[in-house]
Amino acid sequence: MKPSVVLYKSLPEDLRARLDEHCHVTEINGLTAENIAKHEDVFRQAEGILGSGGKVDAEFLRQAPKLRVASSISVGYDNFDVAALNDRGVLLMHTPTVLTETVADTMMALVLSSARRVVEMAERVKSGEWRGSISSDWFGIDVHHKKLGILGMGRIGLALAQRAHLGFGMPILYNARKHHDEAEQRFDAEYCDLDTLLAESDFLCISLPLTEQTHHLIGREQLAKMKRSAILINAGRGPVVDEQALIAALKDGTLHAAGLDVFEQEPLPVSSELLALRNVVALPHIGSATHETRYGMAKDAVDNLIAALNGKVEKNCVNPR
């Protein structure tokens, strides 16, 4: 008998067919409290769930007593209570490898667009402000040969270092839990403590997961240690940066600019002061959002779920037994 699975994010037709081949699938539109209550009987029988977003905690698990596998179409898993999953023996699968290069592309795009004020300049042209030779108040700053600091040297950090060092001749500084031999050997990356990273980086690129230890890791005190000419890039998790402290630093000149793909609250409220600042490039959490990569993530999530339900957990498991 096929295991029962709740799908809470739609899939491409071929991937849905593959899932149907192996599982009895009930599809809902998001893992919301309303949908969970509406499909109470379905969740009571579910052995697997697959999707992105939503909160999976002890309360949810009480409503899904037969759950064995949760497969997330994402690399981050801060919306999952891993301790609660462990208590219940539920495996958590994610998609950490397929999006590496695409997210690194997005981070490099934020570096370039923030430094050269690409979004702001495009808007000026569209609004008819370009009427002759541009003056210095339209100028940006160079990227090549500037120091790029990476906070969190994982797969994405390494891919970013490759782009920055080989493509733009940028010296690489980094801080992580341990030395990264490949980054040091291939890209001459220099390990340093956080204070040194803050003080010396021309671009500080954050590629960290959200944990209790990383929440508001970058706040007022840390921003004050950065160069006034520095640019902060965050494509990791929004709450790693204290957003109010960042806004203050951008307004008073403590920090030159910021390129952001993640925020403390998503979607970013239209009332956010960040949206009123010309020295901010704000994207709607599109780090992995290309057709090719999102398809690859969905495929990995389907494969992960099917494998785990069949007791074949070889990769992409957050909490292997």
Curated annotation (Swiss-Prot):
Main location: cytoplasm
One Pfam family recorded for the sequence: 2-Hacid_dh_C
Molecular function terms, GO-annotated: glyoxylate reductase (NADPH) activity; hydroxypyruvate reductase (NADH) activity; hydroxypyruvate reductase (NADPH) activity; NAD binding
Record-level GO cellular component terms: cytosol; plasma membrane
Subcellular location: Cytoplasm
Broad enzyme group: oxidoreductase
SUPFAM superfamilies: Formate/glycerate dehydrogenase catalytic domain-like, NAD(P)-binding Rossmann-fold domains
Keyword Oxidoreductase set for record: yes
EC code(s) of this entry: 1.1.1.79, 1.1.1.81
Catalysis: reaction(s): glycolate + NADP(+) = glyoxylate + NADPH + H(+); (R)-glycerate + NAD(+) = 3-hydroxypyruvate + NADH + H(+); (R)-glycerate + NADP(+) = 3-hydroxypyruvate + NADPH + H(+)
Keywords: Cytoplasm, NAD, NADP, Oxidoreductase
Keyword Oxidoreductase: yes
Residue stretches spanning the membrane: none
Superkingdom per UniProt: Bacteria
Active-site residues annotated for this sequence: 237, 266, 285
Family classification: Belongs to the D-isomer specific 2-hydroxyacid dehydrogenase family. GhrB subfamily.
Functional note: Catalyzes the NADPH-dependent reduction of glyoxylate and hydroxypyruvate into glycolate and glycerate, respectively.
Known partners and oligomeric status: Homodimer.
UniProt cross-references to PANTHER family, sorted A to Z: 2-HYDROXYACID DEHYDROGENASE-RELATED, GLYOXYLATE_HYDROXYPYRUVATE REDUCTASE B
Record's protein name: Glyoxylate/hydroxypyruvate reductase B
Organism: Erwinia tasmaniensis (strain DSM 17950 / CFBP 7177 / CIP 109463 / NCPPB 4357 / Et1/99)
